[in-house]
Structure formats: structure tokens, C-alpha cells
Design a protein with these regions (language model features):
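N-terminal Rossmann-like NAD(P)+-binding subdomain of aldehyde/semialdehyde dehydrogenases
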Residues: 1-112
């Protein structure tokens, strides 16, 4: 199985960092995914361009932002969403199982 990689988002763009962390199954230590991470220097550099992000958000009305958030919440709860960069889809049930296996929480606690 190809291990998915979860990139960082930098001003809305995917960014694969050299600094990566493995997300492991707490029971057997198998790697479920890798995640890019950025350091404070990268965050500071991005903050110098934060006005572009603010300007993009200001172009949307409050109603549009609420609608976007509502749709995102519905997709998160019910949709099959892309996992990582390779286009593989993850169902809500797959997400619960992965979160349970990497956090050690029982499925019932994760689902709350």
C-alpha cells in the first residue's frame, strides 16, 4: 500500500516540506501517513503575505462564508474526501478507523 502524504497548506497552496512526521498505528507501529511540517521561519515568511489571504476573504460575504463552511462540514461528515496527494479517497468510516488506530481512542469516543 502506498502511504499517503499530507502536505502543509501555505496560503491555500499545498506544500511538501522536507520536515515530515510519521503518523503511526499505536498498536503495531505501522505508518498510516506522513505529514509535512513547517518551522517558525516558514510561518513568519507566510505572515508577511497574510494581507493577500485577508483580501481574498474580504471579497466574500458573510453568507457566502457560512455557506462554504456548511458545505465543508457536510462533506467532512458524509463525503469521501481526498487523502494526501495521490488522489486516494477516504470515507467517513475510514477516517474514524484511522483516527482511532493512531490516537488509541475507541471508535465510540472518536465518533462523538
Amino acid at each position: 500500500m502506498n502511504t499517503p502524504h499530507i502536505p502543509c497548506l501555505r496560503l491555500g497552496e499545498e506544500y511538501r516540506s522536507f520536515n515530515q512526521s510519521e503518523v503511526k498505528d499505536y498498536r503495531d507501529g505501522s505508518v498510516k501517513a506522513t505529514m509535512s511540517q513547517v518551522n517558525a521561519g516558514v510561518v513568519r515568511r507566510d505572515l508577511m503575505q497574510i494581507q493577500k489571504a485577508c483580501d481574498a476573504l474580504q471579497k466574500l460575504s458573510t453568507r457566502e462564508l457560512i455557506d462554504i463552511s456548511s458545505k465543508a462540514g457536510d462533506l467532512f461528515l458524509n463525503g469521501n474526501l481526498p487523502l494526501g496527494e495521490n488522489g486516494k479517497l477516504q470515507s467517513p468510516q475510514d477516517y474514524l478507523e484511522t483516527l482511532s488506530s493512531t490516537s488509541g481512542l475507541p471508535h465510540v469516543m472518536v465518533k462523538r
